[in-house]
Amino acid sequence: MAKLLCTLFLAGFVFLANAYSTDPPNPPDIENVFDGIPSIFNPVNWISNIASFFNPSNWVSNIPSILNPVNWVKKIIDINNPFTYIPDFLNPFHYFPKLNPIKWIPGWIPGLGKDRCLLPKVTGPCKASLTRYYYDKDTKACVEFIYGGCRGNRNNFKQKDECEKACTDH
C-alpha cells in the first residue's frame, strides 16, 4: 500500500511538471512538412526513436497485432507459463509473479484439457441420432457412438480425426 501511495504521490509531480511546460506551442499557421507520410519515412521518428525504425510493426501503419510475430511469442509464453509477470512500479527491474488462471483451469475443472478424454461415454436422454466419436481409455482408440443431442460431456467429438488429435497421447 505504501508503494502505491508513494507512486501516486510522485506521479502527481510528474503531471504537474508537464502541465507547466516551458516550450512554446506550435503556431497554428505553420504546417508540419512531415504530416501525411508514413512513419517509416519520417526522419523525425528516426531521430526520436531509432529502435522503432527496426520494429516491423511500424513499417505498415495499420498492421494488426495478431499478425505481428513479436506478439505471438509473448502470448505463447503467457499461456504456457503458470505465472505471468507484472512489473513493480517503483523498481522497473523487479517483476513479481501473478497467477495465470488459464494455465491451471484444466486441472481445476474436470473435463477440460486432456482430462476430457478420460470421461465416460454419455449418449444423453434426448432422442436425436447424431453420429459422434468418443475416446475409450481402455482400448485407447476413438470409437463411434450415437449421441442423443443433449446433456453429454466433453468426450464427444464430431469427427474421428478431431478425437484422435485431442486424445492420442492418453
From Swiss-Prot:
Gene3D superfamilies to which the protein is assigned, alphabetical: Pancreatic trypsin inhibitor Kunitz domain
Family statement: Belongs to the venom Kunitz-type family. 02 (native) subfamily.
GO biological process, alphabetically ordered: envenomation resulting in negative regulation of voltage-gated potassium channel activity in another organism
GO terms assigned for molecular function: potassium channel regulator activity; serine-type endopeptidase inhibitor activity; toxin activity
Species of origin: Araneus ventricosus (Orbweaver spider)
Keyword Secreted (UniProt): yes
Protein name from the UniProt record: Kunitz-type U1-aranetoxin-Av1a
Expression tissues: Only expressed in epidermis.
Tree of life domain: Eukaryota
Any single Pfam family the record assigns to this protein: Kunitz_BPTI
Keyword Kinase appears in the UniProt entry: no
Annotated keywords: Disulfide bond, Glycoprotein, Protease inhibitor, Secreted, Serine protease inhibitor, Signal
Gene Ontology, cellular component aspect: extracellular space
Post-translational modification: O-glycosylated.
Cystines in this chain: 117-167, 126-150, 142-163
